[in-house]
Amino acid sequence: MTTITGLTVRDIRIPTSESLTGSDAMNPDPDYSAAYVELLTDHPAGLKGHGLAFTIGRGNELCAAAIEAWKPFILGQSLEEIRGDMRSFWRRMTRDSQLRWVGPEKGTVHMASAAIINA
């Protein structure tokens, strides 16, 4: 059985607004950003998972903070149990009684959950 032993998250930002790279009528000054998550395991081969939630700048720290908030729910989980019932894992994350007020299955909660699940 492979167990998740660590979770790190980084708030990565690329100053694309300086050159207006990726700008358009709706997004005049985007700074391409990502809340990047890495899951560590006890697998003998050093198995890791990587995922991200892509944003265009402001608010990226909210996704990173939401990922950090789920750390206690993730650490100690077995990959086999998660893969065996992804639906329950998704619901456990997006329907937490104290975190769901941030946006159940939408917005920050949805993006942060997706980053963890993709990792």
Language-model features, listed with the residues they occupy:
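Metal- or metallocofactor-binding catalytic centers and their adjacent structured scaffolds
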Residues: 6, 40-119
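Structured beta-strand/loop patches that form or line metal/cofactor-binding pockets in enzymes
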Residues: 1-57
